[in-house]
Amino acid sequence: MIPVVALVGRPNVGKSTLFNRLTRTRDALVADFPGLTRDRKYGRAFLSGYEFIVVDTGGIDGSEEGIETKMAEQSLAAIEEADVVLFLTDARAGLTSADLAIAQHLRSRDKTTFVVANKVDGIDADSVCGEFWALGLGEVYQMAAAQGRGVTNMIEYALAPYAEAMGLNRDDDEQAIEEEREYTEEEAEAEQKRLQDLPIKLAIIGKPNVGKSTLINRILGEERVVVYDAPGTTRDSIYIPMEREGREYVLIDTAGVRRRSKVHEVIEKFSVIKTLKAVEDANVVLLVVDAREGIAEQDLGLLGFTLNAGRALVIAVNKWDGIDQTVKDRVKSELDRRLGFIDFAKIHFISALHGTGVGHLYESIEEAYDSATRRVSTSMLTRVMQMSQDDHQPPLVNGRRVKLKYAHAGGYNPPIIVVHGNQVSKLPDSYKRYMMNYFRRSLKVVGTPIQIRFQEGDNPFEGKVDKLTMGQERRRKRALSHINDRKTKGE
C-alpha cells in the first residue's frame, strides 16, 4: 500500500515549502474538507520513483496550553496514520522549547521519525545542526527545501523500506518490459483470463454520513454485524473478502466505527488518509453521494483524487427513495452539469437502506474492472489507431502530415496506450481527444479513465550541427577563395 509521509513541526519551519515541492503544486489535491481540520493538506507525490501521500499537518507552537491540546486536533491524527514522520526544524533559528515539546510527544509514539534541519543554505550547517541531537530522535538530516537541496536524498532514505513493495529494486529493463509489454493476441487472451480469477478490490468512499456503512452492510448481508476500527486499527482500512455469484471481491472499508444495530446512533468517522490510501490500493472505486445534498465540494475532491490516481469509477447516488420527482429531476440535472467531464462512469440511483438498485452496481463494477485491467495486443491497438487515421486524418504541421506508425499498451489500471509516430508532439489537443474517444469506443472501454501517450520517432541528427573534417574545411576554403577570385575578375 502507498506510504504516508507526515510533515510535522512548529510554524514557519518550511513545511508548506516542502509540501509544495514534493507535490509540485501550490495547492493541495484534497484540502479544506468541510468538517476536517483546516490546517491539514493532503497531496500525492512522485519523487525518484517513489509514490506516496504527503500531509502538511500545520504548525504547532508548543504554547502554555500544552502540546497534547495543540496536536490533538490537527497533527496527532496525521502522525498516528502516517508511516513516516518528517520532523522539520529551523536550522537558522536553532533549537526551541516548541521543538523539545514536539520531540517529547514523538518519542512516546512508535513511529519512524526523521529530524530534518531545514534552511541550511548559506550557513555552517554542520556546526549549527549539532544542537538538534538533543531532541533524542537520532540523526539530524540537513535540507534547504526552498532550493530543493537534500530533498531527494531525504525521501529516498526515509522510504527505502518501501522500495521493494514499489518495485524499485527490480532491474530497470525488467520493469520497463512489464510496464510496456507488447502482447500477442494469444498472450492478451490468456492474461485476461487470469485476471478474471483474481478478486476485485473495491474501495467504497464518500464523505461522512452518505450511507457507506448501510451500503456495506447491505452488500455483506443483513445478518452480519460489522464492528471495525477497534483500538490499534485506526490507521488502515479494513479489507473484507466476499463472493457473489462466483466472483470474488475484496471490499476496502473506510467508513469508520459502526455497529449494525446502532448504525444510526454512531457518528461515522472520516479519515482522508484512510480514504486516499484505499483509492490507491483499489481496482475500482465506488463513490457514494447523498441524493438529498447533491454534489458537494467534498465529493468533487474525492472524485479528483480518484481520477488523478487513474482508478476505475462507479458512482452511487444514495437515499434516492423518499424524495419527490421534482428533487430527483433537480439532482439529475446537477449531476449532468457538474459531472459531465466523467462521462465514462456509470451512475446508479440506489437506496442502501432498502436495497433498491444495489444489485445493479455489480454489473458496472465488473465492467469497469474488466476495462481497466484488459490486456490488448499490439496488433489490435495498431489496427484501431490506423482506423482512426482513415476516418479522420491527422492535421498538417508546417506543411507536413503527422504520421502515426504503431501503438502498444503502456500500462493498466488505468489503461495506457502508447502511440509512436513523427511530429506527434505537435498534434493539437482536439485530435488527441478524438483519438482517445476513438480508442474508447472501439475497445468498448467503460468505467475507467484512459490515457494516451504520444512518443516521437527520434531523429538522431536533429539539433546537431555537422562538424567538417580538416580536409573538408581546407576544400571549403579553397572553393570560397576560387569564388571570390572569379567575382573580383568579373568586376
From Swiss-Prot:
Keywords: GTP-binding, Nucleotide-binding, Repeat, Ribosome biogenesis. Pfam families: KH_dom-like, MMR_HSR1. Transmembrane segments: none annotated. Residues 3-166, 200-373 form the EngA-type G domain. PROSITE patterns: G_ENGA (PS51712). GTP 1 binds at residues 9-16, 56-60, 118-121. GO terms for molecular function: GTP binding; ribosome binding. Residues 472-491 are annotated as: Disordered. Residues 374-458 form the KH-like domain. GTP 2 binds at residues 206-213, 253-257, 318-321. SUPFAM superfamilies: P-loop containing nucleoside triphosphate hydrolases (SSF52540). GO terms for biological process: ribosome biogenesis. Associates with the 50S ribosomal subunit. GTPase that plays an essential role in the late steps of ribosome biogenesis. Belongs to the TRAFAC class TrmE-Era-EngA-EngB-Septin-like GTPase superfamily. EngA (Der) GTPase family. This is GTPase Der. The lineage of its organism: Bacteria, Pseudomonadati, Pseudomonadota, Gammaproteobacteria, Alteromonadales. The gene is der.
